[in-house]
Amino acid sequence: GAWRFPGAWPDANFNLAHLKTLIRKLEAAKFDAFFMADHMAVLNMPMAALKRSHTVTSFEPFTLLSALSQVTAHIGLIATASTTFDAPYHIARRFASLDHISNGRAGWNIVTTSNPDAALNFGHDEQMDHDERYRRAREFYEVVTGLWDSFADDAFVRDVESGVYFDPARMHTLGHKDEYLSVRGPLNIARPVQGWLLSGLAGDGAGGRVRLRPPARRGSGGSDFHGRQSLARRAALLRRHQGPRGQGARAGRR
C-alpha cells in the first residue's frame, strides 16, 4: 500500500500531528472539504492481504474532525456515518455538535454499510438486505433532519433578567414513528449552524438513490459521490439524481 512508499508516513491515517499538517495544507490550497471514510468492521479480505493494509486501524470520524476543526477555519469537514448500525438521535447530536464546534463546516457522507461483518459487531447474525438498508436510510435521513429542526434559530433567548433560557414556543417535538424507527425528540442540541448539513451518498444503484432535501441555510445542499466513469455516464447520473432531489426540496424549520 501507499504507506510503504519512500518518504511516506507509515502511520499517516493514525497520526494526529500529521493529519493536522495535512489539513492545514489542504485549506491553504483552497480545497473545499476534507472527506473521511469509515468502516464499521475490519475489512473482509484474506489475511495475507489484510496484514499489509493500513485500514485495520483508523480514527473515529467525529472525534478526529472535531480536533481538526480547531486548527482550520474554512475547509469543510465531511464525516461518514452509517444509517444501518446507529441511531438517528445519536447521529443528529454528533453532527449538530460538530457543526457548532466547526462554525458551520460539517458534512455527512451517508452510507448503509455493505460489509456483512459489520452486522456481527452490532448484535446481528446477518446483514440487512440491500433494498431494506436503503429504505431504512431514507427514513433515517428524514428523522435526522427533523431532529435538527427541534429548535428554531431564535429559540435560545438566554434572557438573564427574566431567567428565560429558551422560548418553549420555538421548540418542536418530532414524534416520529414509522416502519423502522420510533423517535420522539426533541434533540437536546441547538439547531446546527447550517440548519441542515451538506449531505451526500456514494453509489449509483437504484436502491441507493436516497432523496436528499437541501438544507435551509448557508446554501448547503445534497451531493453524490461516484467513482471514475465516462462523461456520458456521469451526465446520466446527474440527471437521475437531480430530479428526486429537486422534487423533495423544502425549507427547514425557522
Predicted features by range, described:
Residues 11-18, 83-97:
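Glycine-rich anion/phosphate-binding loops
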